[in-house]
Amino acid sequence: MRFFEFNQSINEGGKSSGRRYNSEIAILCAIADADMSAFDPANPEQSIPADRLEKSDATYKDIKKLLVPNYDQALFQFWYKKGLAYKDAINNKLADYESQIGQVNWAGGKNQADNAADVGFVGSDVAGISIKAEGGITLANLTPKALGLTPDKGNDIFYHYAQDEFKDMKTKIFTDLLNQAKEQPGQVIAPGSDKYTIVYDENADKFTCTGKKKITADENTILNAVAKNSPWQRVFGDWFQANWQAKKAYATPLFTKIAREFETTIEQHLQQNSSLANMLRFSDKPYFYLSTSGLYFVPSISEVQDLALRGLKYGTPDGTGQLFVAQLARPDSEAVAELDIYVRYANGMFETNPTVRVQTLRNPQYIGWEKLA
């Protein structure tokens, strides 16, 4: 297999529903020879041939359920045209496996751990096509355990590895916002969204913090709660992010300690090839990866058993978490691919515990990805 030389990044992340269903069904229509002269997502039977679908009744039902409420004609047409443009390249590559596009299936709203393809090829040695529209699902939404990080159940991972520094950071953040609220009694403060607010009642000497949960409490009660995250604490996280440039020194001791702890642990864990392969979503079968940056062919996991971690660099924190840059390569290559690994508050700082997200894969040709178009 010849790997082409190119320098591009593959970025993923964000909300997925509308973009996901429009892009996936549009690609399915393009490769299944659908009649698009009068496509109606509420009546897909009239456009998509039943004999091209592995489970036609179930697929039609899923399209009506998932695409209809999210249908965007312009977005759908964009991806349909992209599918048509890449159809020949897909068939040319399938010919290497003595295959061609035949019957297909659709994952629907399910994320399949054992299959990277959103649109699957029935009876083929190639799994299908993984479609990643802008705002689509990340390469891997992982638990911290996937990086070798093992916090106690229910604990914030930053708290687990640096308890004193974590509590000190949150205490400073909480104190600043509480003082700001006290200076403006009765005034609702919403640093980010009006869904997450704080207001001080001067007569009761208490604060009301509103989020997905609400509390009314005095200053000591609030400050004594810094060890655990909670939905009502989102307003403090929003305030810190809004004031990151001025207040980032509050996080320096925490992030300095975490960087040392995480870098060693993650690097040791990722030296295991299976951890790398799972993170990069290599699968038992090869598959196509289609995004706004082009069409790629991703080899099977058996073809990248020699993939190795060359190093792990610590990135610059952005106020929501930690960034690490993994450098990956094949043994016969001096050039490396780079992968950004975020341990971050993706669902609201201090509202929920951090998650691990893998994003921005740069120079994927150095780990076996082949660019086709």
Language-model-detected regions and their locations in the chain:
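Short, positively charged
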Residues: 9-117, 121-373
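Short acidic, low-complexity intrinsically disordered linear motifs used
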Residues: 1-10
